[in-house]
């Protein structure tokens, strides 16, 4: 029986307040309005940015349904939708692409002005929610809201992908993989034969390592305080692994000594202010490029010696790897299907959706790279 045009009752993980576990609830999801799409989520990844909301370091309105990395199937569409149809496999886009704003039209920008990133309103574009639970409206997250069996997104926040693609794998392209991989190949523009360092070897960091290898880097140095991650880092392309706790000097000095003055490209993937500065300082003077990939806490400021930049180093930031969602995500899925890069090594756990809190526990304990939840 078709559910188009009807309110759908389904399971979702609601975060009622920060520093509390997710609560599996029955929620109501209303039909999509004009230029909106309702999606049945098949698989969704657990991202550290979601946990930043739980612990309060990223501020967004609560109660909310989080989640922003997923793959699903279009259930129904609102009036005026032309780019997807019911039955299409899709990836929701937490960085939308309207194709009309100045940012979308610029070849080097991917931060569409219609996105919720940075504004954290917790609604769709009309300022309202499509979710209710126990008679109360529930906030969206980043315009995609994937910790729900069904979600509603704007048409500009979803893109069609290859019908043969395995959603439990390509869902990683919806955030983590693209964020790391693109930071190397698209934003940093890693050069063949260069020396790279990646601070933190989690899922995004490992994706950056994959990108550095794909770009032809000669040396890729993984930096992490968890030695258990080094085997996976080397499997995916790291040539050397360094634990800062093994040294009695700052890690940027260690990297400078290892590389005759500094690396050509560095990637900070944790989101810590001290490691952001350290990643810049480990770069070679005159030409080194450091890319900030990790999401920093709200309302904090960097302090550093401006001579570090005046000496010729460059500092860049990367959201979603610099990719334009509608243009680039289908291409990345096609590249995965063509075996141009792996996703399987990044997935350490596949859990049923009801085990979402167990998945977050593994993330916090550093015992998973990526946990994928399936409905």
Curated annotation (Swiss-Prot):
**EC number(s)?**
1.1.1.1
**Positions of modified residues (N-acetylserine):** 2
Locations listed in the record: Cytoplasm
Q: Which GO terms describe its molecular function?
A: all-trans-retinol dehydrogenase (NAD+) activity; zinc ion binding
Q: What Gene3D superfamilies does UniProt report for this protein, alphabetically?
A: Medium-chain alcohol dehydrogenases, catalytic domain, NAD(P)-binding Rossmann-like Domain
GO CC annotations on file: cytosol
How many cofactors are bound and how? Binds 2 Zn(2+) ions per subunit.
Q: What is the uppermost EC class here?
A: oxidoreductase
- Which domain of life, per UniProt? Eukaryota
- Which PANTHER family does this chain map to? ALCOHOL DEHYDROGENASE, ALCOHOL DEHYDROGENASE 1A
Q: How does it assemble?
A: Homodimer.
Listed name of the protein: Alcohol dehydrogenase 1
Q: List the gene name.
A: ADH1
């Amino acid at each position: 029986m078709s559910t188009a045009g009807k309110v759908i009752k389904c399971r979702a993980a609601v975060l009622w307040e920060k520093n509390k576990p997710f609560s599996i609830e029955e929620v109501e999801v209303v039909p999509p309005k004009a230029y909106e799409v309702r999606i049945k989520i098949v698989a969704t990844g657990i991202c550290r940015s979601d946990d930043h909301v739980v612990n309060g370091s990223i501020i967004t309105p609560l109660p909310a349904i989080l989640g922003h990395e997923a793959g699903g199937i279009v259930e129904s569409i609102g009036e005026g939708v032309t780019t997807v149809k019911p039955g299409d496999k899709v990836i929701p886009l937490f960085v939308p692409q309207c194709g009309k704003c100045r940012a979308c039209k610029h070849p080097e920008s991917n931060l569409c002005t219609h996105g919720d990133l940075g504004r954290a309103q917790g609604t769709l574009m009309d300022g309202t929610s499509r979710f209710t639970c126990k008679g109360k409206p529930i906030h969206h997250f980043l315009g995609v809201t994937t910790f729900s069996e069904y979600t509603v997104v704007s048409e500009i926040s979803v893109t069609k992908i290859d019908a043969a693609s395995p959603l439990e794998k390509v869902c990683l392209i919806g955030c983590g993989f693209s964020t790391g991989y693109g930071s190397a190949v698209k934003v940093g523009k890693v050069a063949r034969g260069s020396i790279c360092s990646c601070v933190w070897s989690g899922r995004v960091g490992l994706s950056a390592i994959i990108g550095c290898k794909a770009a032809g880097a000669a040396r890729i140095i993984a930096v992490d305080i968890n030695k258990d991650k080094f085997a996976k880092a080397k499997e995916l392309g790291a040539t050397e692994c360094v634990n800062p706790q093994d040294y009695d000097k700052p890690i940027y000095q260690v990297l400078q000594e290892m590389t005759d003055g500094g690396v050509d490209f560095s990637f900070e993937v944790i989101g810590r202010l001290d490691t952001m500065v350290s990643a810049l300082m480990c770069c070679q003077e005159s030409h080194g490029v450091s890319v900030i990939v990790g999401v920093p806490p709200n309302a904090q400021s960097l302090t550093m010696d401006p001579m570090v930049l005046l000496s010729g180093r460059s500092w860049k930031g990367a959201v979603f790897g610099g990719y334009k969602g509608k243009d680039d995500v289908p291409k990345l899925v096609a590249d995965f299907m063509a075996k141009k890069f792996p996703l399987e090594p990044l997935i350490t756990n596949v859990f049923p959706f009801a085990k979402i809190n167990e998945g977050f526990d593994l993330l916090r304990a550093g015992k998973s790279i990526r946990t994928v939840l399936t409905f």
